[in-house]
Structures are given as C-alpha cells and as structure tokens.
C-alpha cells in the first residue's frame, strides 16, 4: 500500500513541479507532513497502552479500529507528502537556487545536509521510539513545523527562472527573493 502511495505521489509531484512551482509544493508537503505527524502523535499518546514482552508499553491500535485506520491514513499522508514534494523537489531546488558563483559548493553542502538529516532520523528514531513513540512523532512534527517556516522565509521560487537569474535574486533583499 505504501509503495502505491509513493508511486502516485512521485508521479503527481513530477507533473506539478513545473506547473505549480517548487515553493508551493514544498509548502504543501511541509503542511501535510506536519498534520500527519500531529495526528500520529496524538493517536500514539492517547491510545490504550499494552505491555510489551521486553518491558515497557506500546500503543494498542488493535483495541480501536478507528485509531488504527486514522494512524494508517496519517502514515499514507506523510509518505505521500514527502514522496511527492521534499523527496524529489529538494534535489531539483538545490541545483537551481544558488547563484553561479557558489552553486558547486552550496549544492554539495545542501546535499550533505540532506543526507546527514536522513541519517539522523534513521539513527534517532528507534531510540526515541523505544522511549515514547508518541513523543517521537511530536518531535518530528515540530521539525515539520520548522520546515514550513523555512520555506516561507528562506526558499525562493525557481520555477521558470534561468540559472543566471539566481545571481540577481541572491543579491536582492530577502523579501523580494520569495515570489
């Protein structure tokens, strides 16, 4: 099911990236991921708890079919939002958003930050989830909220721009860079 969601989202993202623009898609993706993570956090924090074999407790989503369905829908929303927006668009955007004088170095740094972020999530999720799965999703929701602010404040729209135009945008005041 998640693979189908990913495939559909990637196709939609490919079809929309040059029509709608990078910035609106990233903003939609961030808002959708934030909403999905908040819903998941609330479900995991409020669901009845069941004892685990190794000690501790975990949310018992089987005790309430509605909670299980909501958690699945939220998971699909998150996966689809990421797969259709941040997953592929970030790579397009980092190749377009930097002025020529710094494009090579900035693209390398941005790609490295993306990989480091993925590594950090992969490394921290099991540890945080063992502590509290609901709180883990809440922390990631806060990060998704920060991505909304990041897009609103710092990400310029690069749709229909020549790479050389990024020099002018980089030299302009921040407010005029966000079209």
Locate each region found by the language model:
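Alpha-helical transmembrane bundle of multi-pass membrane proteins
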Residues: 1-179
